[in-house]
């Protein structure tokens, strides 16, 4: 099962338990996800299955909201969990958001872009200095080594270029491929099936980086390839990434800086949604990370070629109690010697 990963449907097996009790156990909402959360209030999500005719309907729910699970992805946009009728104000707000993000977000929802992304679109990034997906994966794989066996997110996964390589590595206990675009998630699934990518640990999830449906300090590492420039609420998204990373967690991102294609591109107009955001310098990117909550000493930004920025962030690890006690004892001893 591609979409559900650890929430996979449990089949029937021989048992002495009466059929009705077995059905109640299988379809009762008793499985709580330890990573995914409601994007609105952060509450835990319970996996629920119901049988409608010959179909099994799956969803994730809280006490107040329900999020659908289709054959491709778990839909964890905040608007997907709405159970009350859509008001005029809700509609106006959603239309405003769609207009303000028409280039950065809405363009990537079109099926044609999902189709061409690995058929020429992504290849043009080489001209800007992007190393190429295999070289990028090699660096990501090395950087994520401390996250082996943990939970890794491929944010803005697109067509699954990095997702498939992370999945094939079998290095992680759980892999979440997250994107806002339904079309990109469908393309990720199609390519995973076509390439027979291992999907036991993989969950595809539709979500907004500015409202991540993830628990605090639940993620060991996160990748966002060629993505920062296309996030309409970049600062909020980066703060969300910092929120969900564990102590010692790692964030790896690639994006564009000015001059990537030999000319200066217009910066993103505030609230305009009319263009991508090409960053001015490594200093600007580093400051964005620091403002999001990353420690300055744990942020590294470098430029490859004419305009590919590679960002690496490491969250400080929690101090080991024994080390703290040893340091405190040493200070006491030193002070005693001065007396």
PLM regions: where:
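N-terminal auxiliary segments of SAM/dcSAM-dependent transferases
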Residues: 23-107
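Conserved class I S-adenosyl-L-methionine
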Residues: 71, 77-147, 161-165, 187, 250-279
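Class I SAM-dependent methyltransferase SAM/SAH-binding core
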Residues: 151-211
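A short acidic, Gly/Pro-enriched loop at the edge of an enzyme's catalytic core
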Residues: 210-222
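A short SAM/SAH-binding and catalytic strip from SAM-dependent methyltransferases
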Residues: 221-233
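A short glycine-rich, Lys/Arg-flanked "PGG" loop and its adjoining helix->strand segment in the class I
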Residues: 235-247
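Short alpha-helix
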Residues: 277-293
């Amino acid at each position: 099962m591609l979409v559900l990963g650890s929430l996979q449907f449990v089949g029937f097996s021989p048992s002495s338990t009466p059929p009705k009790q077995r059905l109640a156990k299988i379809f009762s909402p008793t499985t709580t996800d330890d990573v995914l959360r409601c994007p609105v209030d952060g509450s835990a999500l319970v996996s629920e299955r119901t049988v409608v005719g010959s179909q099994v309907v799956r969803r994730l729910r809280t006490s107040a909201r329900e999020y659908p699970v289709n054959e491709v992805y778990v839909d964890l946009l905040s608007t997907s969990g709405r159970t009350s009728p859509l008001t005029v104000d809700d509609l106006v707000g959603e239309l405003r958001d769609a207009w303000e993000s028409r280039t950065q977000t809405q363009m990537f929802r079109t099926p044609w872009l999902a189709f061409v992304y690995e058929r020429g679109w992504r290849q043009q990034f080489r001209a800007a200095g992007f190393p190429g997906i295999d070289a990028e994966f090699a660096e990501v794989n090395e950087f994520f080594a401390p996250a082996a066996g943990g939970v890794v997110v491929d944010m803005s996964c697109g067509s699954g270029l990095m997702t498939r390589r992370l999945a094939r590595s079998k290095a992680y206990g759980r892999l979440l491929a997250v994107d806002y675009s339904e079309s990109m998630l469908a393309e990720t699934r199609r390519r995973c099936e076509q390439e027979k990518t291992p999907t036991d640990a993989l969950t595809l999830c539709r979500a907004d980086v500015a409202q991540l449906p993830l628990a605090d300090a639940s993620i060991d590492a996160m990748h966002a390839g060629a993505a920062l420039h296309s996030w309409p609420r970049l600062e909020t998204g980066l703060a969300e990434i910092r929120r969900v990373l564990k102590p010692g967690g790692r964030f790896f991102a690639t994006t564009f800086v000015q001059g990537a294609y030999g000319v200066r591109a217009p910066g993103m107009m505030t609230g305009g949604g009319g263009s991508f955001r090409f960053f001015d310098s490594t200093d600007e990117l580093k400051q964005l990370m620091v403002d999001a909550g990353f420690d300055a000493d744990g942020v590294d930004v470098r430029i490859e070629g004419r305009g590919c920025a590679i960002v690496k962030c490491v969250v400080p690890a929690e101090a080991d109690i024994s080390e703290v006690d040893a340091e405190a004892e040493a200070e006491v001893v030193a002070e005693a010697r001065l007396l």
